[in-house]
Amino acid sequence: MDIAIVGGGIGGLALALTLHQRGLPCRVYEAVPAVKELGVGITLLPHAMRELTALGLGESLVRQGIENRDSRFFNRFGQLIYDEPRGRFAGYPFAEVGIHRGRLHLTLWNAAMTRLGGERVLTDHQFVGLDQTDRRVTLHFRSSAMGAPRAPVEADIAIACDGVNSLVRRLFYPHDELRFVGINTWRGVTRARPCLTGRSYVRAGSIQTGNIVIYPIIDDVDGEGHQLINWTTQVAQPGYERNDWNKRGRLEDFIHIYASWKFDWLDVPDLIRRSDVIFEYPMVDKDPVDRWTFGRVTLLGDAAHPMYPRGSNGAAQAIIDARVLADRLAEGVDAPAALRAYEAARSGVTARVVLANRQHPPDYIIRRVEELVGDTPFDDLGRYISRDELGRLSDEYKRVAGFARKDVG
């Protein structure tokens, strides 16, 4: 069986490595002319680390990032609402890791280049179309750098791993649109002294009044004890519908929301102001679709189930997709049947995560407290909600997203 993977991002590379591990030949076709270390931070939850450890990459990723020790939720006045241990500190068999997205991507890329060989991991291949029969699929590409057509590529099956704006998906869903909800985000990374434990994943404030997520991704980045700290602000802005993923953000558009957020554990406006770079883009997803598989073509990761980046789950779900699909293909059944079996196993699961990220994401804890207490500091949170109830809210998201402790073995 010859498998073509359209897209060399996290999902596509995880699939290539997993297929190679199962003895199934594949080729990766990535659009960019050259792969570089780009992006900001990403969190690898224990179920993602389970899959990456099975690929032999777990220890390397822990070394390159920072293993999260705890998660803490604060209101916008800096008061602690709830905290809990994370990853191995919570009894999971695998770590939870904050890491630079570019480091994660290059780790996967270099592993694929080493294991599959450079002739099977190709750049500068922009997808433009496909044809298929009941026996084969033919893919058409052009050079991203030069614009010239490339020779057609034939394969037994094709897997679309080309992201939230998937061109492959658009062939089957030509009227498919991103779902904008009027939430804008600004993201950056800042060199700073460690915050709290130095391994804490922090969420503060609600989207209605201004939310920020903060976690470290590189330790001792300068030899002087500073960390590279990733931060993401999320603010409700009705009517915001610009699909621009690489737009540079402007500090003056949002810093006023956080001007008073100077806590004894962190000066938030100072952290934001000292960022090396700020990116701005809207929070979007797409409604779950009934079908991913069309003959000898299927969708994976964000091409199949784009979701809000609110639960550190987008990459994790793509990586799990890769393992499930590789396992089905390795069973040796008819290839289109294997694609359908993969879809049956994953579509319902991921649809529930998409909806959970909309309705009850991890920071729902903060919103719930704001609903009970109001937009004001509290004297005794226990008068409004118990710690056990807060824990149940946190555990419910873990259950839906597939990383409850009992499910990660």
Please report, for each region that a protein language model flagged, where it lies by residue.
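A short coil-to-beta-strand element that immediately follows conserved catalytic motifs
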Residues: 121, 180, 197-200, 263-281
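Conserved N-terminal helical subregion
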Residues: 1-3, 20, 47-189, 238-241, ...
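Active-site substrate-recognition segment that forms the wall
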Residues: 74, 200-241, 258-260, 283
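C-terminal helical "tail/cap" subdomain of flavin- and related membrane-associated enzymes
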Residues: 1, 63, 78, 311, ...
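Conserved mid-domain beta->alpha element of the FAD-binding
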Residues: 8-23, 27-32, 159-160, 186, ...
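Flavin-binding catalytic cores
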Residues: 244-277, 335-336, 343-344
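Conserved N-terminal glycine-rich FAD pyrophosphate-binding loop of Rossmann-like flavoproteins
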Residues: 33-51
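Residues at the starts of beta-strands that form the adenosine-phosphate
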Residues: 2, 25, 228
